Amino acid sequence: MKKIIFLFLCPFLVFCQTSFDGVESLFENKQYGKAEVFLSEFINKNPDNLKAIELLGDAYGHQKKWDKAIDVYELLVKADDNNANYHYKYGGVLGMKALENKLKAIGFIGDIKYSFEKAAELDKNHIDTRWALVELYMELPSFVGGSMKKSMKYAQELENLSKVDGYLAKGYIYEYDDEPELAEKYYKMAITEGGSLTCYDKLTKLYESENKPKEAIKNIESANKKHQRNALHYQIGKVAAEYNVELHKGEKCLHIYIKNYSAEDGVPKAWAYYRLAQIQTHRKYKAQALKYINLAITELPSIKLFKKQKVEILAL
């Protein structure tokens, strides 16, 4: 169920141009506490404004205040039982609450399934809720209703709505069911059909999980050829360093990453230095490895993994 987390949070932000549209900037800047205060005050004066109430639930969700979010979405479901998004969000926060308290999780499962299935019934085009159902039924144990057959049913519904989502969902199902060849087939179909970075990333992670680093690197190179993202240079270097393969290519890509680095790339340069240190450690080039690990530690001194790598280098 952990894989559902982003489905609960990503769809939260649905803004409207009203007297409280200033909340949009608070969400964009991740100032969820301020958004909560703003919306609470607004709702005190406008208690029947369902959009404001929904946004308050979203603010609670982003802050992982699951109990408060549950209360808000339950109120919305009671106010409008035919709103698919309300059911979807209610099921989502119940799921997150269940993840935090495994002892009570079984008690939430019935309501979670009902909420997602109700959302799917109300909105035949609701992609997110079908994704949630695919993952829910795969990850639940069979004795509480888990079912690959049901998961595949919703994957097929996804494919009818969006071939890419359907292929990714089927790839996920087969990967979870430990059928990597079928998972690879569907991830490749998703790449052919859509070719987004997400599609490539799913296949890359599958190859890594199957201990196929050379295939992973080849796939990342294909993604970079199409999307031309500097972050993909880091990914190539990471795989090369972790699996001790294609070290020259990995080193070259990491230097490109560092040279062209910007905050948008996501991974701090310190991690690229760490990967370079790993590569030089594989080669047993102690001086070069120390040079790069010291650069990594200087930039991010609190990372324990960097310090562990330095101990390994000093032992060369």
Q: Which residues are covered by each model-predicted region?
A:
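N-terminal leader/linker segments that initiate helical-solenoid repeat arrays
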Residues: 14-67, 85-88, 310, 314-316
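Residue at a conserved register position within TPR or TPR-like alpha-solenoid repeats
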Residues: 26, 60, 94, 101, ...
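Structural motif corresponding to the intra-repeat A-B loop/turn of tetratricopeptide repeats
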Residues: 29, 63, 97, 140, ...
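Residue signature of alpha-solenoid helical repeat architecture, marking inter-repeat boundaries
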Residues: 47, 81, 88, 107, ...
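Canonical tetratricopeptide repeat
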Residues: 51, 55, 62, 89, ...
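TPR alpha-solenoid repeat register
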Residues: 52, 86, 129, 166-168, ...
